[in-house]
Amino acid sequence: METLAHRITRTVRELRMVTWGLLDTAHPILAQIVPMRRCNLACGYCNEYDKTSDPVPLGTMLRRIDRLGELRTGIVTISGGEPMMHPELDDIIRRIRDRGMLAGMITNGFYLGPERIERLNQAGLEYLQISIDNVTPDEVSQKSLKTLDKKLQHLAAHARFHVNINSVVGAGMKQPEDALTVAKRASELGFSTSVGILHDQSGQLQPLNARETAIYDECVRLGQGLYTRINDFQKNLIEGRPNDWQCRAGARYLYICEQGLVHYCSQQRGYPGVPLDDYSSDDIRREYATPKACAPYCTIGCVHRASSIDTYRQPLVKLRTFARASSIL
């Protein structure tokens, strides 16, 4: 379990990242980067994997991490595919930390064991998230509590980084109650929990029914940590109502695919489609102000959360303007 010393260190780094985010808009808060598109699983709802691609060469990955550092990115989350299939994952994590950025990872958890967790500790991983889809594996998903519970116990015993367990409700989930079972088990083990709404291949969703909504609400009440607290955007979506918000994808949030191109997110790949090596502050400023047509019904939590810092930033900007006009500053 994450020690108090590690938690304090991580919290200080988080506060520094948030402070800089409030002061300046011309840099990414969060970048999600793919070192490995291949996955050991084949979940029926997922469009983010293949079965054939090779890992991105380490030198290429390190260059991309360096570029994210040059763009003053706050957090880098490694995803896939399944990132733990990359043979030099630990070196990628170390490079993120060496460049002063917070290091996170999204994994299906199948490769986690005591020795592998200790290597992640040594590499400097700070966050890890696993989404667990059901209690018992089925034809849609093998990411079940039955399959992964031992891995969760290993994490509770050995991980010195923050662990968040995400459960899922929505279309395609046969037993909505499984989400609550997963959340309760994660809480028992001392992890933070969150609940997501399963989206379609464009990041949109259908409203939840009454049963799913009740389970969602209970999971939210059970949840703890930042993932659960910044979830207001889901309240409208579960009732089929749009959100009125400014998506900052391409600016505050970057999705970098295995080819090294910058996209809005995992579900809106193709634009801007600019190589990360060429992505500049001008691109960030342009996308910061660009409305996104998919935003009203978007369920992509990481984009909402990265964009949310500017919601809190606006009152500070207004206060600063007022203070200057009043000769306070």
Label every PLM stretch briefly.
Residues 29-34, 230-236, 276-289:
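Short, intrinsically disordered, charge-biased short linear motifs at domain edges
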Residues 259-329:
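Flexible mid-to-C-terminal extensions adjoining Fe-S/redox cofactors in radical SAM and related proteins
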Residues 18-22, 239-243, 284:
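Short, P/G- and charge-enriched loop/turn segments at secondary-structure junctions
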Residues 33, 37-40, 241, 288, ...:
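Processing junctions and N-termini across compartments
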Residues 38, 42, 46-49, 250, ...:
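Cys/His-rich metal-chelating microdomains
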Residues 56, 102, 122-127, 131-263, ...:
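Radical SAM enzyme [4Fe-4S]-AdoMet core and its adjacent flexible, acidic
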Residues 2-127, 320, 329:
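Conserved alpha-helical substructure of the radical SAM core
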